[in-house]
Amino acid sequence: MVAASALAPMLLAGCATQPAYERPALATASAWDNDVRSVPAADTADLAEEAWWKSLGDPAIDTLVEAALVDNPTLGQAIARMDQARAAAGVSDAQRLPQISLNGSVTRARTGGTQAGSGTLTTTQSSATLGPGLSWELDLWGRLKETARAAEGRLDARTADAAQARLSLTGQIADAVLRLRACHFSLTVRERDIAARELELAVMRERLSHGNVAPVEPANAASNLAAARTDRISRQEACARIVNELVALGGRDASVVRTLVTPSPGGTALPPASLDRRSPLAPIAHVDADMIIPDPPPIALALPAATLLDHPAVVAAEREAAARWAEIGVARADRLPRVDLVGLLTGNWIRMLGSTSSFDTWSAGAELSAPLFDGGAGAANIRGAQARYREAVEALRDAVRTAARDVEDALAGQQSAQQRIATSREAVEAARVVLRANEARWRAGAISMFELEDSRRQFNAAQESAIAAARDRAQAWVALVRAAGGRVSMPAEAPTGSDIMNSHPDQGNAQQQ
């Protein structure tokens, strides 16, 4: 008895058919190539779990993300796949335990025959059996253990996939809202440009009626107006496509999306295209880019090794590799003998010839099965499992490289956008000075209205470039959070987008003199 009790854990634990899994060696850079402040991995927080998008301070993003997290088919599929993997892991764990079943049967039979001297003899018999049965596979070679490990690895992979789907969804919504805000501002610029060109065409036609210009001048003005209207139509289509994208992601109606995104995040609507009392057409009032596009707070990353290995896509690929490694052990164990403990306890009831009898039977033992000849199928299964593991390792290496590239691209984009913001603001200020000077010259009769309107268009275009740079900076910030898998550090003293907007409540109003 003592020997049996000592042997039982060994039988349950089994003999390993291969070494324990070790994560493949992954090459990562010692530091980020683009300039970024690195912090210890312990100081980074998982912003993916902390509603990172709220750091932008954009109510439209907050509302659409909240709707998408409860009603997005892609995310729902990822969660369903995670639940499937959890169920499969439960099945694999259950297979390592004894399987107990209840077996029973009821039969009634009649037999008849001819007996010498007594004629025909008919006998009716009724019988019933009922009892439990037990079957328990001894995991001698770790087949069941490796099967459970493979299922656990896939559960971890699907969990990471769900986290990646959630991060990707929230990032797509934030990116689309930023693009839609910039698109609306760009559309307003084109509306004002069309209004200016319509006035120019009217003036040209009036001058043509007095013989002051050649017919080619109104024709050129009409051509420019048609081109501007075509550009506006294309911009309207681009804005509509972004709205459709947000509808598909968040499940909200297009009208709701437009209502949410039309005002600026700071609550100030874009200036209307109304006429000015001092000139035929007023330029778009100066609007600070931070009032149209949220100014994201600064963030820091851990070193590449810590950041990349915690990325959900990398985690999913690594856990899939672990599952494939375990399946090699399963394939090896399938070629070895298998021992099952079986037991049966049956109660029997029989009635025949008017008498009834009942009795119990039991049996216990072990069943041995082993492949003798399979035509090489077992060896082929092992080679296939090994090839699938190598494929998973290469997928893991690719996931690390892709994540590193995405982080570096986002860092480069953020730096470029930050520099363009500075230069575009200088361009806006210079264009404003030129516009005000030309307005004064136009009132004094020193320049024509066409020269004035050209300076207006330059000012509007400079503002549009500033908004585009602010959009690119915010998009790069979103891309950086996504590329880092949400594992970033945000200084406690760093202001959020809403803090910056609330500190300048009057920005976005006209600042003309």
Describe these PLM feature segments.
Residues A128-L134, A176, L303, W362-A366:
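Hydrophobic, lipid-facing positions within transmembrane beta-strands of outer-membrane proteins
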Residues L144, G153, A160-L303, G413, ...:
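Periplasmic alpha-helical coiled-coil/stalk elements that build and connect Gram-negative outer-membrane
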Residues G211-A214, A403, A410, G445-S448:
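Alpha-helical heptad-repeat coiled-coil segments that mediate oligomerization/polymerization in large
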Residues G76, R96-T124, S135-Q164, C183, ...:
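Small/polar (Gly/Ser/Thr/Ala-rich) solvent-exposed segments
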